[in-house]
Amino acid sequence: MTTGGFDLGGLDIGALLAQAQSVQNQLEAAQNQLAESNFEGTAGGGLVRATVTGTGELDALTIAPEALEDTDAETLADLVVAAVKDATGQARAMQQSLMPQMPSLGL
């Protein structure tokens, strides 16, 4: 097939555009699903809990009162970081699990 002097090799532009629109719609649905999801990470046997959104934004941080009694500041900071990393890791895993479901355009 030639268009304006270019050989498109039988490429169906209409089908390609329809497939691109379908991929865009699926990507938007996946992004919405992530935006509505929350992921909780824990550290120190549950002494510290962090909740992040599907986009990785920290939404909540809970520190058990006993963590304040029995833990020095440096250890507590390490537990907070570990809980946040746990939660963001779960969000990232969900993001990656949704992306392979996206069809390719077959170019």
UniProtKB/Swiss-Prot annotation:
Annotated GO CC locations: bacterial nucleoid; cytosol
Name of a matching Pfam family: YbaB_DNA_bd
Subcellular location(s) per record: Cytoplasm, Nucleoid
Keywords, alphabetical: Cytoplasm, DNA-binding
GO MF terms held by the record: DNA binding
Gene3D superfamilies assigned: Nucleoid-associated protein YbaB-like domain
Subunit field text: Homodimer.
Function description: Binds to DNA and alters its conformation. May be involved in regulation of gene expression, nucleoid organization and DNA protection.
Protein name from the UniProt record: Nucleoid-associated protein PPA0205
